[in-house]
Amino acid sequence: MKLKKLIGALAAVTLAAPGVALATNGYFSHGYGIKAKGMAGVGIALPQDALAAATNPAGMAFVGDRLDVGVDWFRPIRDSELAPNVMPPMTGDFDGSDKKNFFVPEFGYNKMLGWNMALGVSVYGNGGMNTTYANGPAPFGGIPLFNGGTGQRTGINLEQLFIAPTFAYKINKNHAVGVSLNLAY
C-alpha cells in the first residue's frame, strides 16, 4: 500500500514539474542547414543536404549530388536581472542587446564518385548572441566594476567559421563512414 502511494506521489510530482524548453543552445546551432534545423537538429542521424558533414561526415554518402546555400537569421533576446540585494546600485535589469540581428551564412557541396563514395565540402558558422553591456554602475565610490576602470564596455562575442572538406564511403545501403578536416577560423 505504501509503495502505491509513493509511486502515485512521484507520478504527481513528475507531472507537475516544469519542463525545460530551450529555444537556443547559445553560441552553437542545434542543426546545420534549414532541413536539420526544422527537424530539431536530427541531421546527425538523418542527413538531408550537403551540410551533413557539419554533424556527421558519413552522411554525405547518402545525400547525392547537390549544392546547398543559405543564411540563418538569428535574433535572440538577451538580458539579465539582478534581484534586490544589499548593493542597491547593482539591482535592476541589464540589457546586453546592442546588436539584435545575426546573419550566419552556410554553404555545402557534395559530389558522388560512383554509387558508394562522396566528396564534398560544408562551410558553416557558429556565433551570434554577442552581449555588450553599457558601462555598469559604480557601487563603491565611483569604482566601475564592469569594465576594469578602462571606460570600455563589458561584453562577449564569439564568431566561428568552419570549412569541412569531406570524404564519405558507403559500406552498404544503410551504413557509411566519413572523415572531415575541420578548418576553423
Which residues are covered by each model-predicted region?
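Extracellular/periplasm-exposed beta-strand and loop segments of Gram-negative cell-envelope proteins
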Residues: I77-K100, G127-A164, Y185
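Outer-membrane beta-barrel transmembrane strands
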Residues: D98-M112, G155-A176
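N-terminal, post-signal peptide beta-strand-biased segments of exported outer-membrane/organellar beta-barrel
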Residues: P18-G125
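Short acidic/polar capping segments at secondary-structure boundaries
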Residues: N126, A168, N172-N174, L181-Y185
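Membrane-spanning beta-strand positions in outer-membrane beta-barrel proteins
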Residues: R66-D68, A118, T166, A176, ...
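Gram-negative bacterial Sec-dependent N-terminal signal peptides
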Residues: M1-L22
